[in-house]
Amino acid sequence: PLEEQSRPINHDLIPNNRFDFNNNDSNQTIIMLGNQTCSRRSIEYLPLKVLEAYLSYGMSAALFKLFREKNGITYDLGVYYPVRSGNAPFLVYLSVTNKKALFAFELLLTLWKDLLLNPLIDAEIHLAKEKLKGSFLLGNQSLDEILQRKIQLISYGISPISEVDLNLKIDEISSLDIIKLTNKYFSKPFLSISGNESICLEIANRWKKNF
C-alpha cells in the first residue's frame, strides 16, 4: 500500500486564529469544534473511528446522553468524520436554541477536556468497538456496497482486508491509543459558530480562556 501523504497538522497556538463565526438572525446557534486528523491510510484511522462510535453512535453515545438525555437542549448533534485520502476533519457539531447556546458550549468544553484528560473505561471502549463493528457490517449489506467500499480503499492505495482481520484490528485498540490521539489532534482545536453575533462573541470570550 501507499505511504500516507498527510499534510502538516495546524497547531496554531493563538485561539483567535482557530475561531470563526457567521452572524445570522435565526433562533438557533450552530457550534462545530474539532480539527483535521489523519488520512484513511493511517493506522490512526481506526482508533479515531472508535472514538467517533463512543461519541455519536446510538442513544447510548456520550453526546446523546450528555446533551439530550441529561439536559435536553439540542436539536441536532453528532460527529463529522468523513473518509479522506488526505487529512480528514473530525468535528463535533450541535445546534441549540439561542437561550441554551452558552450552556451547550460549556457542556461541550467539559466533554472535550474529559477526552483530553481521561481514558475511556473498559465498558465504554468495549461498547464503542462493538458499535463500530456493527456499523461496518451495515455498510456491507449488498454486493454494490461491498464493491464501492473496496474500490474506494484501492483508490487510496489500501488493500482490502477481511471482516475477521478488521475486527481483530479494532479489538487491539486501547484507551491509551485513543487518548494519545485526542491530545495529538484536539488539544488546540478549531471552533466555528453560526448564530446571533452577541452570542458568538460571548462564546469567543470563553473560548479564548480555555484554548
Descriptions of predicted regions:
Residues M32-C38, R68-L117, D122-D171, K188-N196:
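M16 family metallopeptidases and their MPP-like homologs
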